[in-house]
Amino acid sequence: MLTASNTKAPEQTKVIVGMSGGVDSSVSAYLLKEQGYQVEGLFMKNWEEDDTDEYCAASQDLEDAQAICDKLDIKLHTINFATEYWDNVFEYFLAEYKAGRTPNPDIMCNKEIKFKAFLEFACEDLGADYIATGHYVQRELRDNSWKMIRGLDNNKDQSYFLYTLDEAQLAHTLFPVGHIEKPEVRAIAEKAGLITHNKKDSTGICFIGERKFKDFLGQYLPAQPGIIESAEGVAVGHHDGLMYHTLGQRKGLRIGGLADAGEEPWYVVEKDLLRNVLIVGQGHNHPRLFSKGLIANQLHWVDRKALTSSIQCTVKTRYRQEDVSCTVTPITDSATEEYQIDFTEQQSSVTPGQSVVFYKDDVCLGGGIIDTLIR
């Protein structure tokens, strides 16, 4: 159980930093140590990889995290959250793909592992006052409540991935690099002699690493090959499984050499689950790529106050997208909590299973899962 937010001086305040072996968490630990906090690190193992797996960098990440903690003269704890990860993140990931949707496991990992399992373990078992992570996001106390604020570095802002956090979690979390731009973070690391200063940022889904996504997913879900049809209903190719494709996808469709097809590239515009057919259209302005709105469910508001009437705000339907103005309206006749989002301008490649995240200026209000599109 989380207690009231800490008011002790830094030297009396214990902070457990989630150490990933990357530069952002390294600098987070360094800055907190410089500010006088009692700092310890914690490395989470969330995936039971095959020891012979040449693609997995977990052991190198642990080695780097240990080297940073040794350099800073702080203790490094390690913990295995693989069971929690499998039950709460990976099974969700598989279920969504099986349902023909495109999930974002990083958001679920933040919700279930980093800001639930890790936060509870740090506070309850290690006696922490706070946890800290290397996320590019800020928190601010406004009107006596904690708000999630976009990271200063607009190119690295990670509030999109953290919309499930609530005020209690924000009250117990520090984001030491949220007010710093990425190049400066690397400069701080280099000046401090941290070996991660030039380490490449991790990309892709954590449990897949550098492996090919198609090969990995095929180990867990049986592929169901089928036909690719044009939006006009003409067969134009074959797919290896709908789960390997997402709306707006252009690459890897293997469509070509069709008479009278023209030169414009093909894009995925829909997935027909009942017929196991992938539907494609030509050109990035194909009308079936666009939506004027969406229905979202599984909503999380940072203040945990559900809407009772419409609001005007801005929204992102994918990471690093420019904000889009919209109206958010609760659907009162729905059996589950659902919201209708109407864009002021039509949006391309909005994808069911991905997250829609709401903003008011620099404040992240919350978000939810895209369920259906309004065209």
Swiss-Prot record:
Record's GO cellular component terms: cytoplasm
Q: Which Pfam families match?
A: tRNA_Me_trans, tRNA_Me_trans_C, tRNA_Me_trans_M
Q: Which GO terms describe its biological process?
A: tRNA wobble position uridine thiolation
**Highest taxon of the lineage:** Bacteria
- Site feature (Interaction with tRNA) residues: 135, 354
Record-annotated active site:
109, 206
Instruction: Give each disulfide bond as a residue pair.
Output: 109-206
Keywords in alphabetical order: ATP-binding, Cytoplasm, Disulfide bond, Nucleotide-binding, RNA-binding, Transferase, tRNA processing, tRNA-binding
The UniProt GO MF terms for this protein read: ATP binding; tRNA binding; tRNA-uridine 2-sulfurtransferase activity
Q: Which family does it belong to?
A: Belongs to the MnmA/TRMU family.
This protein's name:
tRNA-specific 2-thiouridylase MnmA
